[in-house]
Amino acid sequence: MENSIRSLREEIAGFRISSADELEAFRLRYTVRKGLIAGLFSQLKSVDPARRPEIGNMLNQLKAEAEARVEEAALSLEKTTSPAAPTIDLSLPGRRHFTGSEHPVQKVLGEMKQIFSDMGFTVATGPELELGSYNFDMLNFPPDHPARDMQDTFFVKRDGTEDDILLRTHTSPVQVRVMLDRKPPIRVICPGKVYRNEAISARSYCVFHQLEGLYIDKGVTFADLKATIYSFARQMFGSDVQLRFRPSFFPFTEPSAEVDVTCYLCGGKGCRVCKKSGWLEIMGCGMVHPNVMKNAGIDPEVWSGYAFGMGVDRTVLLKYKIDDIRLLFENDLRMLRQFPA
């Protein structure tokens, strides 16, 4: 029995394992339940009982050596057959780093500011969280005006008094603050975010950017207003842009008008964006209402002025032929990278 164990140990030590097939052959020959080592274990019952423990220990040691040989060979084969670590090709270009740029809304707003700055306007700003008196009362809004309803306005505190606190629905309150703080002549633009409780769609959003303008001086007429808007539109949209003024109504201006430009998609022929009219509205405007001037302590018998307001986001849609305003708020890099610095 001892000679059989010694002979099998030498055979195991000399067995060459260099492939998965050879490893499997080794396992089947020596370590499985019907292998040679298991066969020797089955012969223990014929060994002298006095020597049986000694022979049993020798077989256990042989079995452990064979199993260790299997594990060692398996690890060695795994290392040699695993894919090689990828090498770095130093001649290849590195990963591209994209240069940051202005958001299209900020880009267009900057252009608008520059155009009006060249006309002599200065920039004025104010709080986005506004008092109801500045947002409505001083701008000649009647108490029952629909804009005061919660369906149109985000109220932070509402008790039906001048102390209502809300997210401003336009940047006109900045004009009120300017008229209260400065003496005429006044020539300012008021850019900023505004908030309205509107359904989100391709053409409207609950938060957007607005730019309003105010000019007060002696002898200001509607002709001055039209000249300013014509000059702005041609610099912003191109010298061939067509404009039209439509009579309208705003509580804070009289007379009032809405300004349209030819549709950027169809060129005035009619499409779904312009609702087959060929025109797109870009702003509202008019002569400052005498009541607004009186509320700010300015004598309308001496001074006159005009005001206008437009959505910056809508101007972005017009300028870059974007058909969905929601794209401006989704932070989709595929869209934003189309507007390089």
From Swiss-Prot:
PROSITE patterns: AA_TRNA_LIGASE_II. InterPro entries: aa-tRNA-synth_II (IPR006195), aa-tRNA-synth_II/BPL/LPL (IPR045864), Phe-tRNA-synth_IIc_asu (IPR004529), Phe-tRNA_ligase_II_N (IPR004188), Phe_tRNA_ligase_alpha1_bac (IPR022911), Phenylalanyl-tRNA_Synthase (IPR002319), tRNA-bd_arm (IPR010978). Pfam families: Phe_tRNA-synt_N, tRNA-synt_2d. Mg(2+) binds at residue 254. Transmembrane segments: none annotated. It is found in: Cytoplasm. Keywords: Aminoacyl-tRNA synthetase, ATP-binding, Cytoplasm, Ligase, Magnesium, Metal-binding, Nucleotide-binding, Protein biosynthesis. It catalyses: tRNA(Phe) + L-phenylalanine + ATP = L-phenylalanyl-tRNA(Phe) + AMP + diphosphate + H(+). Belongs to the class-II aminoacyl-tRNA synthetase family. Phe-tRNA synthetase alpha subunit type 1 subfamily. This is Phenylalanine--tRNA ligase alpha subunit.
